[in-house]
Swiss-Prot record:
Keywords: Chlorophyll biosynthesis, Porphyrin biosynthesis, Transferase. Binds 1 dipyrromethane group covalently. This is Porphobilinogen deaminase. InterPro entries: HemC, Porphobilin_deaminase_cofac_BS, Porphobilin_deaminase_N, Porphobilinogen_deaminase_C, Porphobilinogen_deaminase_C_sf. GO terms for biological process: chlorophyll biosynthetic process; protoporphyrinogen IX biosynthetic process. It is an enzyme of class 2 (transferase). Its EC number is 2.5.1.61. The lineage of its organism: Bacteria, Bacillati, Cyanobacteriota, Cyanophyceae, Synechococcales. Monomer.
């Protein structure tokens, strides 16, 4: 069966639409004659801006509404920032494609007052804006003299708050800034020795309905195998730790020759306890490598740390 029409579900935020429009353009180029439409919508995570993400809960915070459209037959695929896509998907849906990864690093963005500073030179009491518990925990571990403040809203709103003086700096994903045309605002790429990135950060995940090989065949044109292999290991680690998108679990992955090197981290919210380790193995065992590293981290106390965090940030009723 040759697919002639494809319906995409997308978040309607500016970054999400930039990403979805890129996917649409790439698919149209790969499949001339394919008619593609986009339905944009707000998700729960887009609507609730006055509560910290971890307090809302992270079960499909930015994905559930898109998945509902596929499950009722109103969309064929959904485009996600892969870091927002839970590791356990609803029955009947699958991760069909992972695109080539942009730089997954976290980035320091400063206002004019702090233009001369790097992360290491920010003065005591400097206010750092982040909505990520992962970034918060790692930076608290390395920079306990800084003050951390939650920041919500889209990237443009966050930059406006920074430039208005509400924060001295922000920590944002370099990939998102670049895709939105704000690459010039990246003041410093934070080394992985300081901040391991989120699982899947920098890659797009295309989710689709199971049992539709014609859709899978179309979207596989955008698959980047090395990125998919790395993210398979990262997502296996996250799934095995029973973590979610909003907990302080960080990763870094590299492919060297035919081997995958995976680094993982779990930290307490105050940053005082940080467990970090590595696992290496053949690239055809990438999922097993993720699971094995998770077990190693658990043996060092990661499970206890995560249990405390889940209790502390239990979603509000």
């Amino acid at each position: 069966m040759v697919l002639t029409q494809l319906r995409i579900a997308s978040r309607r935020s500016q970054l999400a639409m930039v990403q979805t429009n890129w996917v649409q353009a790439e698919l149209e180029q790969a499949h001339p004659g394919l008619s593609i439409s986009v339905e944009a919508m707000a998700t729960q995570g887009d609507k609730i801006l006055d509560v910290a993400l971890a307090k809302i809960g992270d079960k499909g915070l930015f994905t559930k509404e898109l998945e509902a459209q596929m499950l009722i037959g109103r969309a064929d695929i959904a485009v996600h920032s892969l870091k927002d896509l839970p590791t356990n998907l609803p029955e009947g849906l699958m991760l069909g494609c992972v695109t080539e990864r942009e730089d997954p690093a976290d980035a320091l963005v400063v206002n004019q007052k702090n233009a001369e500073h790097q992360l290491d030179t920010l003065p005591e009491g400097a206010i750092v804006g982040t909505s990520s518990l992962r970034r918060l925990a790692q930076l608290r571990h390395h920079y306990p003299h800084l003050v951390f403040k939650d920041v919500r809203g889209n990237v443009i709103t966050r930059l406006e708050k920074l430039d208005a003086g509400n924060y001295d700096c922000l920590i944002l994903a370099a990939a998102g800034l670049t895709r939105l045309g704000f690459g010039d605002r990246i003041h410093q790429l934070i080394p992985s020795e300081i901040s391991l990135h989120a699982v899947g950060q920098g890659a797009l995940g295309i989710e689709c309905v199971e049992g539709h090989p014609e859709v899978l065949e179309v979207i596989k044109a955008l698959e980047h195998k090395p990125t998919a292999q790395r993210c398979l290991a990262e997502r296996a680690l996250l799934r095995e730790l029973e973590g979610g998108c909003q907990v302080p679990i960080g990763v870094n992955s590299r492919i060297e020759a035919n081997e995958l090197l995976l680094t993982g981290m779990v930290a307490s919210l105050d940053g005082k306890r940080l467990i970090r380790d590595q696992q290496r193995g053949p690239i055809d065992r990438c999922e097993a490598i993720g699971k094995e590293l998770a077990e190693t981290l658990k043996s060092q106390g990661a499970g206890e740390i995560l249990a405390e965090i889940f209790a502390a940030v239990r979603p509000e009723a």
